[in-house]
């Protein structure tokens, strides 16, 4: 079969842009954490890249996008081990590209999604528990939600729309973050100590790469080149720009100083919030939506962290959860078939029922994300424990869990086993 070369090239490129978001996320998070925990987040994300890719190969893609079974609940195992995925034929989801190109794009999306939760569990979760957690979260939360909405499952059959993941990815991850923060508990020095970012330039660089990668994340969901993909990129950019300015303005008013950390968090909130509706909305409405997302997510930050004192280390609950909810519900108001004939109309264009469908999808993601994460972590806590010891938390996960440092002291640096023992001594973990 002859494929559309332009579409195929774009999807391959989009997959590369989404892949870029994985190291970008590590840079963003590591820069905002304290120095003693920088290596730990790189380890979590790099391990997740390999582990979640293999899970996708074994059964993840098949459960998410395989032929429907159990009345729209989950896919079957026809595509397990990538069997029955043709090299020279398309899948039904994208008729103009090779089936394996669709699989690859969805794989990097499935990798980056659970890794968003590294932002909430930072500086206190055991690595062994992290491994089990992201695996269980993918199986019990991400794969079912992906099938329900993108794989032709029961929510899709009820009219729920989500262009690139506002419900499937960000609402579920944001609500999971609240549950994870509650079950894990606050960091030992949360509150009394000022937990300042250790390297803001690295965080800004990571945020800029995330912004770039998001063009592939959102516009790749068009699954083709052309006007829709082009509009989606511009919509994504403008919403992020608007939200970034809102966060900078609000933090400036609140503290008296303009903050670049607020700016990058606001940009990320805008990228998250526009994800669900990016392929259904005009540019002018995208600016309006991005502005609203900025206000809503900043308010969420104040409520969750400062009023309720939920220790969500990097504010996944507000930046992803609140933003994802607002953008997903916005489909019910601003979506237009003039932008995407395959999508829905919102209330502004005569379809008043779409908002109800979006409420349903968001509600299901909230319940599954929060409830599923709560259950997973409670079971894991009983079986394996989920927090590092107080001693390891105090010295940092880099030395305590990995015997490595982000910024080694050259005078004390040793080679091989001696280096490992030296780090153990400095960390206070050596029995010598």
Features from the language model and the residues they span:
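Glycine- and aromatic-enriched membrane alpha-helices
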Residues: 1-432
